[in-house]
C-alpha cells in the first residue's frame, strides 16, 4: 500500500497547525512549528489568497493527515459516515476516533498514530483477548486493549504511556498503567474532539 515517506514536519507546516505526527518531538521546542511556522518551500513566507475550494481542501487534508490516512481510506470512512444516522461530519470524526490505531494512541500505548500502527502490525496487542493486527479495526465501547505479556517490557510503550499520563488521557478511555491494559469506554462526543477541526467543510467538499 502507498505511504507518505516525506518529512512529517512539513505536513504540519503545510496545514499551519500541529498534527502531532512525531510523538514527543511535537511537544518540545524542537517542533518545526515552533521554529518555522510558515508553509514549506521557496515561497512559503509569502501571503497567498486561498480560493474557497482551497479552504475546503486544506481542512480535509488536515484531518486526513492528523489521523494518518490515505485518500482512499479516508473516503471509505466518509461514505460509511454518510450512511449512518446523525450528522455526517460528527460521524466521520467519531469513526476516525474508533480506529484501533487511534485508540492505542489515545490510550498512551504509542507516542504517535504511526507508532501505534507499527505496534498493531507487529501483533503486539490483544483486543478483548484476541490478537488483532489491523490498524483500521473499529473499536466499540467496552473494548479492552491489552499489550501481550511477552511485549510488556518494551521501553517505547512504557515511555509513551508515562508521557501520556503526565499530559492526561481523554475522558473516553482509561488505562491500567501497571498491567498495560486500556479500555475504550465510550464514543467521544463532538465537544470532546479537537476544536480546530471543521468537519462541515469536509462534508461540503465531498458534496460538490
Swiss-Prot record:
Keyword Transcription regulation: no
PROSITE patterns the UniProt entry points to: RIBOSOMAL_S4, S4
GO molecular function, one term: structural constituent of ribosome
Gene Ontology biological process terms from the UniProt entry: ribosomal small subunit biogenesis; translation
InterPro entries, A to Z: Ribosomal_uS4 (IPR022801), Ribosomal_uS4_bac-type (IPR005709), Ribosomal_uS4_CS (IPR018079), Ribosomal_uS4_N (IPR001912), S4_RNA-bd (IPR002942), S4_RNA-bd_sf (IPR036986)
Domain S4 RNA-binding: 98-158
Gene Ontology cellular component terms for the protein in this record: small ribosomal subunit
Entry annotated with the keyword RNA-binding: yes
Keywords, in A-Z order: Ribonucleoprotein, Ribosomal protein, RNA-binding, rRNA-binding
Similarity comment: family membership: Belongs to the universal ribosomal protein uS4 family.
Subunit structure: Part of the 30S ribosomal subunit. Contacts protein S5. The interaction surface between S4 and S5 is involved in control of translational fidelity.
Job of this protein: One of the primary rRNA binding proteins, it binds directly to 16S rRNA where it nucleates assembly of the body of the 30S subunit.
Protein name: Small ribosomal subunit protein uS4
Organism phylogeny: Bacteria, Pseudomonadati, Pseudomonadota, Alphaproteobacteria, Magnetococcales
Amino acid at each position: 500500500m502507498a505511504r507518505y515517506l516525506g518529512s512529517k514536519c512539513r505536513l504540519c507546516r503545510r496545514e499551519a497547525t500541529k498534527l502531532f505526527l512525531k510523538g514527543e518531538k511535537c511537544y518540545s521546542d524542537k517542533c518545526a512549528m515552533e521554529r518555522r511556522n510558515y508553509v514549506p518551500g521557496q515561497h512559503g513566507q509569502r501571503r497567498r489568497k486561498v480560493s474557497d475550494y482551497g479552504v475546503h481542501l486544506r481542512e480535509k487534508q488536515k484531518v486526513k493527515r492528523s489521523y494518518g490516512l490515505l485518500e482512499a481510506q479516508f473516503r471509505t470512512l466518509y461514505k460509511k459516515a454518510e450512511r449512518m444516522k446523525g450528522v455526517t461530519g460528527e460521524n466521520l470524526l467519531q469513526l476516525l476516533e474508533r480506529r484501533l490505531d487511534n485508540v492505542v494512541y489515545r490510550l498512551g500505548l504509542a507516542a504517535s498514530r504511526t507508532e501505534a500502527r507499527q505496534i498493531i502490525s507487529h501483533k503486539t496487542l490483544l483486543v478483548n483477548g484476541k490478537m488483532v493486527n489491523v490498524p483500521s479495526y473499529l473499536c466499540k465501547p467496552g473494548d479492552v486493549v491489552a499489550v501481550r505479556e511477552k511485549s510488556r517490557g518494551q521501553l517505547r510503550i512504557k515511555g509513551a504511556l508515562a508521557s501520556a499520563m503526565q499530559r492526561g488521557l481523554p475522558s473516553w478511555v482509561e488505562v491500567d498503567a501497571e498491567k498495560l491494559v486500556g479500555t475504550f469506554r465510550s464514543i467521544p462526543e463532538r465537544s470532546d474532539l479537537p476544536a480546530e477541526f471543521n468537519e462541515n467543510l469536509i462534508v461540503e467538499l465531498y458534496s460538490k
